[in-house]
């Protein structure tokens, strides 16, 4: 148990940064053994999804530390054009795609970097259905980024919103 106002102990750090054993996550473990994956993720900026995603793909969050505050969502569209890993792959002649869920309607990755990725929206941003088809046929690009669905019954591995409140003892939480 963490103590308020006290420096965490080494054991408490281990709990916070702990993970799962391969046996606990057989599907992910199988994927990790067969493909290049990140098994130790350290955020470029300790913040929310958009700044972290931007830092991951473009090595900058443009100084933004929140998804929406201090400029709204428009700040992402108005951000300076900054090359992304996708642009570098394009320059190197390597294939790439961003796969996103149809329910989301647009790729957040594409929106965050619209200034430099808009020319590729029709050619390199595809549905998860297309991902399944590409994978089944053995036609995945050299680099694939699978974007989780972050709205409409999300599958982004964050805990569901309001889960405790919806449970049997929700009134007690």
Question: Where do the protein language model's features map onto the residues?
Answer:
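N-terminal pro-sequences and low-complexity stem/linker regions of secreted or lumenal proteins
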Residues: 1-173
